[in-house]
UniProtKB/Swiss-Prot annotation:
Taxonomy, superkingdom: Bacteria
Subunit and interaction comment: Homohexameric ring arranged as a trimer of dimers.
Designated name of the protein: Ribonuclease PH
Alphabetical list of Gene3D superfamilies matching this protein: GHMP Kinase, N-terminal domain
Organism: Bacillus pumilus (strain SAFR-032)
Amino acid sequence: MRLDERHYDELRKIEIEAGYITHPEGSVLISAGNTKVICNASIEDRVPPFLRGEGKGWITAEYSMLPRATAQRTIRESSKGKVTGRTMEIQRLIGRALRAVVDLEKLGERTIWIDCDVIQADGGTRTASITGAFVAMTLAIQKLRAEGAIKQNPITDYLAAISVGIDSQQGLLLDLNYEEDSSAEVDMNVIMTGAGRFVELQGTGEEATFSREQLNGLLDLAEKGIKELIEKQKAVTGEVIE
């Protein structure tokens, strides 16, 4: 049994609250245990210069963390005047993952900006951001369709992400909190579609190597968690695949 009394294959308590912020076209607060992220989706009727005249849209993301989202205060990146490599990596990951499940031509020449702001961090902030961002994006696209701005549904599948890892004492674990992530011998972030296809895997043997058998176990565990997350998403968005 883990410190928070979860079983090895059990998600933290997942809550997705829609309409958390008034102004964005899509907005949610996603909570994964003590990790909480506000995910907003904003629509602009223009695309980056490299896509002008191409007849397709774009999806991009920004990610940030409040100074006291963590146990010790961190300096705002805006105060430093530059974005850290970690932040840049996560931003690109979120945008890349969302684009994998959207037909950009059906979106038309518009951009969906995803803003993920971590207000409390206890591990899994990037995976929670992706899971919440998909819901925020879907709500924004549903609004576009309701207004008649687009006729066809550009979303091709659901999308969610989760962390898995290997602990020297407890073995395989699903949905690591900060303490578990810090002590894990192996940790991995897995992004998958509703059809069970992989979008991205980020895995590292921090303190130990791992076998093919263990890798398969991690992926099976991640797939189980992602199926559960997608059911949570559907409770907010309804069925979005036509």
